[in-house]
Swiss-Prot record:
Described purpose of this protein according to its UniProt entry: NAD-dependent protein deacetylase, which deacetylates internal lysines on histone and alpha-tubulin as well as many other proteins such as key transcription factors. Participates in the modulation of multiple and diverse biological processes such as cell cycle control, genomic integrity, microtubule dynamics, cell differentiation, metabolic networks, and autophagy. Plays a major role in the control of cell cycle progression and genomic stability.
Keyword Ubl conjugation belongs to the record: yes
Organism: Macaca fascicularis (Crab-eating macaque)
Keywords from the named record: Acetylation, Cell cycle, Cell division, Cell membrane, Cell projection, Chromosome, Cytoplasm, Cytoskeleton, Membrane, Metal-binding, Microtubule, Mitosis, NAD, Nucleus, Phosphoprotein, Transferase, Ubl conjugation, Zinc
Protein name: NAD-dependent protein deacetylase sirtuin-2
Single GO MF descriptor: NAD-dependent protein depalmitoylase activity
The gene coding this protein: SIRT2
Active site (UniProt): 187
Reactions this protein catalyses: N(6)-acetyl-L-lysyl-[protein] + NAD(+) + H2O = 2''-O-acetyl-ADP-D-ribose + nicotinamide + L-lysyl-[protein]; N(6)-tetradecanoyl-L-lysyl-[protein] + NAD(+) + H2O = 2''-O-tetradecanoyl-ADP-D-ribose + nicotinamide + L-lysyl-[protein]; N(6)-hexadecanoyl-L-lysyl-[protein] + NAD(+) + H2O = 2''-O-hexadecanoyl-ADP-D-ribose + nicotinamide + L-lysyl-[protein]
Cofactor, how bound (note): Binds 1 zinc ion per subunit.
Keyword Transit peptide: no
Basic and acidic residues: compositionally biased ranges: 378-389
Length: 389
């Protein structure tokens, strides 16, 4: 092994770190020594990796107006959207943890050992009934995509949408007009279902699953009689392979990261914000700030790239705080798209209403399964769900 070069600044500094550690181990002031070591390490990384250097701003101002002007420039050609439950709540779809209205606060009647059990694959295989009872309660029918969903549709229509990464399993992105190629459904989807038997894996469409749910029949495979499960990611299951394959290529070429309606607390989805190059602006539209982290600790722990909205070194991150639909309307207005967006929402909602009216069940038979819409309009719903790391 080559000997360390004492003239190299990093190796010299590293030697000092070792000396400090050796000295500290022999001292009684461990707490004070640990504090000094942390300060020394901060200085080390700042000097060798330019952690503390001021970066040139990527936007002419760190505001929504600055983002809009950037989007209108030649520099912004590929937008990635990262979305969570907050973009679907205005459609009447609850998130999981909001007090009194979140799904976890309304599961007592299912007599679960703990709320999360309803989404655990091991519990589901033994006791599928609570999940399908909940699925019937939550099944949309009347739910429509929101302004946020249609804003992403506009990005697609204008050739700006590179990909939408969604934590939601409600299929509203598809109903709004995004196609399979546009989407990475990180936590799966109700759009398709599969037999849980590894030797079978027969696939079933949403219309088939919808009929079973509304007839209160536990879905069983027509080939082998095993359970059939919607393709949502339960606790204990891996994320779809597409999540990782798209991530590897998409974030090499993204020009703007648009984050909407997510707390950025669920891994590995939350780590996607750190995949964007340092030269890529990031806009958060959410009710509260999210995704912030200590840049030093983030680098040490491999969680670098946290949002920085407020420090003197902020250079690319913008937070618009409030209702997600209102945030999209505000951005659309700055882009000159507001009327186009509002017209799109009205037109699409009218189409959904017309179809729902044509398919409305007879009141005397309302308990019967409803006729399934064609695939382009298929709907299902739960919402963003916390996944274990």
């Amino acid at each position: 092994m080559a000997e360390p070069d004492p003239s190299h600044p990093l190796e010299t500094q590293a030697g000092k770190v070792q000396e400090a550690q050796d000295s500290d181990s022999d001292s009684e002031g461990g707490a004070a020594g640990g504090e000094a070591d942390m300060d020394f390490l901060r200085n080390l990384f700042s000097q060798t990796l330019s952690l503390g250097s001021q970066k040139e701003r990527l936007l002419d101002e760190l505001t929504l107006e600055g983002v809009a002007r950037y989007m209108q420039s030649e520099r912004c050609r590929r937008v990635i959207c990262l979305v969570g439950a907050g973009i679907s709540t205005s459609a009447g779809i609850p998130d999981f943890r909001s007090p009194s209205t979140g799904l976890y606060d309304n599961l007592e009647k299912y007599h679960l050992p703990y709320p999360e059990a309803i989404f655990e694959i091991s519990y589901f295989k033994k006791h599928p009934e609570p999940f399908f009872a909940l699925a019937k309660e939550l099944y949309p029918g009347q739910f429509k995509p929101t302004i946020c969903h249609y804003f992403m549709r506009l990005l697609k229509d204008k050739g700006l949408l590179l990909r939408c990464y969604t934590q939601n399993i409600d299929t509203l992105e598809r109903i709004a007009g995004l196609e399979q190629e546009d989407l990475v459904e990180a936590h799966g989807t109700f759009y398709t279902s599969h037999c849980v038997s590894a030797s079978c894996r027969h696939e079933y469409p949403l219309s088939w699953m919808k009929e079973k749910i509304f007839s209160e029949v536990t879905p069983k495979c027509e080939d082998c009689q095993s359970l059939v499960k919607p393709d949502i990611v339960f606790f204990g299951e891996s994320l779809p392979a597409r999540f990782f394959s798209c991530m590897q290529s998409d974030f090499l070429k993204v020009d703007l990261l648009l984050v909407m309606g997510t707390s950025l607390q669920v891994q590995p989805f939350a780590s996607l914000i750190s995949k964007a190059p340092l030269s890529t602006p990031r806009l958060l539209i959410n009710k509260e700030k999210a995704g912030q982290s200590d840049p030093f600790l983030g680098m040490i722990l491999g969680l670098g790239g946290g949002m920085d909205f407020d420090s003197k070194k902020a250079y690319r991150d913008v937070a618009w705080l409030g209702d997600c639909d209102q945030g999209c309307l505000a951005l659309a207005e700055l882009l000159g798209w507001k009327k186009e967006l509002e017209d799109l929402v009205r037109r699409e909602h009218a189409s959904i209403d017309a179809q729902s009216g044509a398919e409305a069940p007879n009141p005397s038979t309302s308990a019967s399964p409803r006729k399934s819409p064609p695939p382009a309009q298929d709907e299902a719903r739960t919402t963003e769900r916390e996944k274990p790391q």
